[in-house]
Amino acid sequence: MITMTNWESLYEKALDKVEASIRKVRGVLLAYNTNIDAIKYLKREDLEKRIEKVGKEEVLRYSEELPKEIETIPQLLGSILWSIKRGKAAELLVVSREVREYMRKWGWDELRMGGQVGIMANLLGGVYGIPVIAHVPQLSELQASLFLDGPIYVPTFERGELRLIHPREFRKGEEDCIHYIYEFPRNFKVLDFEAPRENRFIGAADDYNPILYVREEWIERFEEIAKRSELAIISGLHPLTQENHGKPIKLVREHLKILNDLGIRAHLEFAFTPDEVVRLEIVKLLKHFYSVGLNEVELASVVSVMGEKELAERIISKDPADPIAVIEGLLKLIKETGVKRIHFHTYGYYLALTREKGEHVRDALLFSALAAATKAMKGNIEKLSDIREGLAVPIGEQGLEVEKILEKEFSLRDGIGSIEDYQLTFIPTKVVKKPKSTVGIGDTISSSAFVSEFSLH
C-alpha cells in the first residue's frame, strides 16, 4: 500500500533542525579548485550568426561528440550545442590562445565566484558562518574581491609561520583564472535544436586549475592546515588528463592519508571527467574517501569505466534519471569502492546510500534541496535565513512519481528504506521553473548535505 508522505512538513522540520545545528561545525577544509566565472546568457540570433560565420557543418560535428579539449572556435560552438541539445552540463579546457581571446571578446553578462572550492567557501563560510580554509590556486585582486565576508581563510607564510587570513588580506598580483559559462534556459532554440531543460557549457581559460596546481603552503604544511578542520571536501580532479594526472593524484592520495590519520571525514565532489584513465584513477581513490557526491551524467560515466556500459546507458536514457538503474549504479559503486556515503542528485529528486542509518540523512538532503531551490530562485543566497524562502517553492511532480516507484520497490517510509546493509534515503526536490542561474547548484546541494548531516549526527 502506498502512503502519501507529508513532505512539506518534513521540509520545515528539517530546516528547523539544521538551523539549530549547522554552526556547531568547527571547520571545513576545501581543496583544490577556485576560479572566476564569466557568465554569458546565450541569445539565439547571436549564436546562430557565430555558427554560420565559422562553418555550420564543422560546428555540428562537435554537437554529436565532445572533443577532449577545445583548440578551435568550431569546437567551442559545437560543444555549446552539445549541451543545449541534451540539456546537460559539460566543461572543457580551452587550450588555444585564439579561442580564449575569442571568448574574451564575446564578453560576459556577469562575473561571479567560480570553482567548486570558491562557491562552497562563500556558501559555508559566508552564508552558514562555518569556518572554512580554502585552496585558491591564484589569488588575483579580482579573485579575492569575489569572496564574501565571514570566516573564510587562506593559509599564508609569515616569517616561516603559517597564518590564516581572509583572501582579501592576501598579497595581490597573481593571475586571473577565468571560466566562461554559456547559460541557456529550458526550451532555448538554436538552429533546429531545443534545450529539454536549462543548463550550461563551460570553457575554462585557466592554466592552474586544469592541472590541479597546488600551492606550496598546502604541500609543505598540509597536516597543520588539516588539524584546524573537522571535515574536508575535495574537488577539482575532473580536468586532469592521462598525460598530466600522475603527480596530482599522488599528492591527493598523500593528503587523503593525512586526513584519514586525523579522523577527518573527506567528501569527494565529483564533476564530469572526460578522460577515462583519470576517471578510473578517481574511482580507485574513492576507498580513501568517506563520501562522494555526483549527478546522473557523472554516475553513468563512473559505472561505464567500471565495465557497466549498458547500466550507464540506462541511467541517462530517461529524464528524470531512471531511479532503479541509478540505485543499481550506486550499489555497485559503494560495494566496489568501500566509500561509506553516496549522495546522488538529479533533476526532481535526490538519493543517499549510506552505511550510517537515521533520519538525519534525510533531513540533510531536505535542507540541501531548500538551499538549491533558494539559490535557483534568487541567483544567490545571502544569509542562512534566506533558505526559508525555499519552502515556498513547490515540490516537482517528477520526484513524486519517482517516490511511487521506490515505495513499491523498496518499501520506503517517509523517504527511508534499506537495501542490503545500507540505508536508502530518497527525497523529491523543490523545482524552480525558471531558475536565475544553474551554476554552482550541484556544489550547493552536496556541500549543504554533507556538512548539515555531520552537524545533525
Curated annotation (Swiss-Prot):
InterPro entries, per database record: ADP_PFK/GK, ADP_PFK/GK_arc, GlkA, Ribokinase-like
Gene Ontology CC entries for this record: cytoplasm
GO molecular function, one term: ADP-specific glucokinase activity
Pathway annotation from the record: Carbohydrate degradation; glycolysis
Residues binding ADP, per UniProt: 295, 345-346, 432, 442
Main location: cytoplasm
Necessary cofactors: Mg(2+)
Swiss-Prot/TrEMBL GO biological process terms: glucose metabolic process; glycolytic process
Cofactor: record remark: Binds 1 Mg(2+) ion per subunit.
Enzyme class: transferase
Matches recorded under PROSITE patterns: ADPK
Stated regulation of activity: Inhibited by 8-bromoadenosine phosphate (8-Br-AMP).
Pfam (any one): ADP_PFK_GK
Family statement: Belongs to the ADP-dependent glucokinase family.
Protein name from the UniProt record: ADP-dependent glucose/glucosamine kinase
Origin organism lineage: Archaea, Methanobacteriati, Methanobacteriota, Thermococci, Thermococcales
